[in-house]
Amino acid sequence: MIKIDFEKMGGLIPAVIQDNESGEVLMVAFMDEKTLNLTLESGKTWFFSRTRNKYWMKGEESGNTQDVVEVLTDCDADTVVIKVKQNGPAACHTGNRSCFYVKYENGSWVEHSNPLFDPNTVYKK
């Protein structure tokens, strides 16, 4: 039986979140064993925030949740790809559909931002 290897990165694994229909990579976040199990049990994506040092469910503040369609691991069992149905317009906390909207062009990084919501309105803190 394959067991996910959480030890290589100090208890965390990268989780690549991909739109199930388009194949677009929406975001990359980190999971520990607890958040992977929460994801598998609930059918929603859960992560561990290294910045805030806490667990969080995608969309718990914005409403832009993710329904899990399929979960895969790589040949080393130290990374997962989670194919999701994205609920709401955007996966990124900046309001963009994907967190990957900055592109390397002609020797520099260029932002191709097209926010679908205003983060200042959605994340009222």
UniProtKB/Swiss-Prot annotation:
GO terms for MF: magnesium ion binding; phosphoribosyl-AMP cyclohydrolase activity; zinc ion binding
Keywords: Amino-acid biosynthesis, Cytoplasm, Histidine biosynthesis, Hydrolase, Magnesium, Metal-binding, Zinc
Residues binding Zn(2+): 75, 92, 99
Cofactor binding: number and manner: Binds 1 Mg(2+) ion per subunit. Binds 1 zinc ion per subunit.
Annotated catalysed reactions: 1-(5-phospho-beta-D-ribosyl)-5'-AMP + H2O = 1-(5-phospho-beta-D-ribosyl)-5-[(5-phospho-beta-D-ribosylamino)methylideneamino]imidazole-4-carboxamide
Residues annotated as binding Mg(2+): 74, 76, 78
Alphabetical GO biological process terms: L-histidine biosynthetic process
EC number: 3.5.4.19
InterPro entries attached to this UniProt entry: PRA-CH, PRib_AMP_CycHydrolase_dom, PRib_AMP_CycHydrolase_sf
Keyword Ribonucleoprotein assigned: no
Complex formation: Homodimer.
NCBIfam families recorded: PRK00051.1
The protein's name: Phosphoribosyl-AMP cyclohydrolase
Species this chain originates from: Geobacter sp. (strain M21)
Gene: hisI
